[in-house]
Amino acid sequence: TCALPISAKGGSEALFSTSLPATCFPNGSSLACSWDVELVHQMGQALGRECQHMGVGILLGPGINIRRTPLAGRGYEYYAEDPVVSGDIAAALINGLQQEGVGASLKHFAANNSEYRRTEMDSIIEERALREIYLAGFQRAITKSQPWTVMSSYNRLNGVQTSQDPFLLTQVLRDEWGYDGLV
């Protein structure tokens, strides 16, 4: 016999039998190891075609959090500890995806360092480290690809919830980088 999982809300979204067939592409960590932006661009195009086929208008990704530890719960999803590699790989995926008419949602902006209690955690980071490590990949991806959306992270950054942070969302993202997409 097989026990099927039921969500805490009683819905069917957790049932494996309700999912649709889809291609299993390599995870973010594997993609970054290739350093092959053309291959990642082609993968973005393939993802875009699958999304179009399934009626998906915006893909909730890529995620480019900095991989601080291999033990992070979703660390496999993120590209690297290097913001240049992360930004370049993300831009390639985004450009391929959006070339097929499907938007990307670059996430989690910014300094989302843990999955454990991430809505309660506060990432305390000096501005220089924030800009050189945690924001540089986002800036690079946004400059090279203009994703349709940017998803804020769930944590606080230096005491301010990132989804309400005027420094992060207005000063940096909008004013300094010129991003005009949806947040």
For the regions a protein language model found, what residue spans apply to each?
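Glycoside hydrolase catalytic-domain context in secreted enzymes
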Residues: 1-183
